[in-house]
A protein has these predicted regions:
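Active-site SXXK
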Residues: 36-37, 48-74, 152
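Penicillin-recognizing serine hydrolase domain
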Residues: 25-28, 32-34, 39, 91, ...
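Bacterial Sec-dependent signal peptides at the C-terminal "C-region" and cleavage site
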Residues: 18-26
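Sec-dependent N-terminal signal peptides
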Residues: 10-19
């Protein structure tokens, strides 16, 4: 297995050079076999860096672990009919599929406020032994939301345990029903921020992207291939195309 793993690392190095030669800084790449519990390929996996909207997976974990009513409607001040109300489950879909920052904030406010939610997120990170992880807000906009690839694999596997997160984050698109001020019902379809890969690969079970200037282009996934489960973490990419190409090569040639 060691020889096989070494060959995969060589292949990944070539892929990294080809796909990311224009990157200004080092990129984090981690592919971990969850089923057999061993790393396959790694690069900069202990580097602490901003994680952008990958943060929202922890926001979702805190929401679901709280046991709060997902069918209750709460205020939402986002792009879909500002000052309207949606159920927490609808907002959870918007947060994980579209990566809607206002949905994350609305969920936090409805639980106990943003400060309380961030406190619970950090508390859960410590409980999961994610000691290099720190959350500063619920959406990931803050550059102070930081983690490592190793920690994010822990968070991914914890998120996978929740049916809601698996079902929602694996949706390529979500249909939201909205009612305007004249009581007219409309349906708005939003695409998953990882829709290109999800449309091509049916092995993706959990998925979340993230993008900020500080974090670069980020992607975390759990995929299932040939009877085994893998975590894929890519942080600090220069372009979404680079990250997508790297993820494609990992899914097709590495695992």
């Amino acid at each position: 297995m060691a020889r096989h793993t070494k060959m995969k690392k060589i292949i990944l190095s070539l892929i990294l050079f080809t796909c990311l030669s224009a990157s200004a800084g080092a990129i984090t790449v981690y592919t971990y076999n969850i089923t057999k519990q061993y790393p396959i390929v790694d690069a900069e996996i202990d580097t602490v860096r901003p994680i952008a909207s990958i943060t929202k997976l922890m926001t979702a974990l805190v929401l679901l672990e709280s046991g709060i009513d997902l069918n209750e409607k709460v205020p939402y001040k986002g792009m879909f009919y500002s000052h309207s109300k949606f159920t927490r489950e609808e907002l959870l879909n918007l947060m994980l599929v579209k990566s809607d920052n206002r949905a994350a904030e609305a969920l936090a406010e409805s639980m106990g406020g943003k400060l309380w939610t961030v406190y619970q997120m950090n508390k859960r990170a410590i409980m999961l032994q994610m000691y290099d992880t720190k959350f500063d807000d619920v959406s990931g906009l803050s550059a102070k939301n930081i983690s490592t690839a190793k920690d994010l694999v822990i968070m991914l596997t914890d998120a996978y345990k929740h049916d809601k997160i698996r079902d929602i984050s694996a949706l390529s698109r979500y249909d939201l029903k909205v009612v305007d001020k004249k009581n007219r019902e409309k349906h708005i379809q939003v695409n998953n921020t990882n829709v290109k890969l999800m449309n091509k690969y049916d092995i993706i079970e959990v998925s979340k992207t993230g993008t900020t200037n500080a974090a670069g282009k980020c992607l975390v996934m759990i995929v299932h291939k040939n009877g085994e489960q893998y975590a894929i973490v890519i942080l600090g990419g220069t372009t979404r195309a680079d990250v997508d190409n790297l993820a494609k090569n990992i899914m097709e040639k590495i695992i």
